[in-house]
Amino acid sequence: MAFLEVVTRTFRRPAGLQRNRASLAAQSDADYVHTVIVDDEGIGVEAANARLADVEPVGAYVWVLDDDDWCIDERLIERLKGISENMREAPAVFVVRMDHRELGILPDVGRWCGHVPPEGAIGASALIVRADVWRQYREWWRTGRYASDHDYIAAVLNGEDHVVWLDWVVSAISRRSVGRPEVFA
C-alpha cells in the first residue's frame, strides 16, 4: 500500500492537471498513488464534491489536491513519513497550509492550530487524513452544499483527537477558480 493517495478532481483544466501531476512527480519520495476523478460533463462543484465520498482509499493517507492546485513541497511525503514513523500511533490527521493567492496563506495565523477555521478560511488540501479516518467521514462530502469541503473538514477536526498541525505551506492554487474550466486565449 502506498503511503499517500492523492485524489485530484478535474474538469477541462489540462494545464492545471499537468502542473498537478508534475508537482507530484517531483516528490523526493515516490511512495504515492494518484487517483484522478475526471468530470467530462460539467456536473458542478456540489456533485464533484459528492464524488469524493465514493473514493475507496488505496493509500495509508488521503490528500485531496484538485487540478488547479499543486504541491510546492518536494519533500512532503518524506517529511510526513518521518513524523508518522516517530510516533507511537500514526496521526489521524495532518493539517497543513496552502498558498491561496489572493486569500493568502490558509489557514491564516489567526485561525491556526487547535480549532476549525471558519468556512472560506481553509481548503480541502489542508487535510491529509489516514485511510480509516477518510472512510469514517467521507460521507460529509455529500452534504449537497458548495462548501461541503468545509463540512468534511469540520467533521474530521471536531471528531478526531490525534491531529498534527504542521506549519508547512505545501500546496498552492493557480487562481480562485470556483469550478470554472480553463480558458485559453
PLM regions and their residue ranges:
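Active-site donor/metal-binding and catalytic loop motifs
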Residues: H100-R101, S125-A126, L166-A185
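A recurrent flexible, glycine/aromatic-enriched loop bordering the glycosyltransferase active site
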Residues: V109-I128
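Acidic donor-binding loop at a coil-to-helix junction in glycosyltransferase catalytic cores
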Residues: G144-Y152
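Short beta-strand-to-loop element that shapes/binds the nucleotide-sugar donor at the catalytic cleft/hinge
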Residues: F94-L106
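Short beta-strand-to-loop acidic/aromatic patch adjacent to the donor-nucleotide binding site
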Residues: G59-W70
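Short, acidic, metal-binding catalytic loop of nucleotide-sugar glycosyltransferases
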Residues: T10, R19-Y32
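Active-site nucleotide-sugar/metal-binding loop of Leloir-type enzymes
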Residues: A50-Y61
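Acidic donor-binding/catalytic loop of UDP-sugar-dependent glycosyltransferases
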Residues: D69-I83
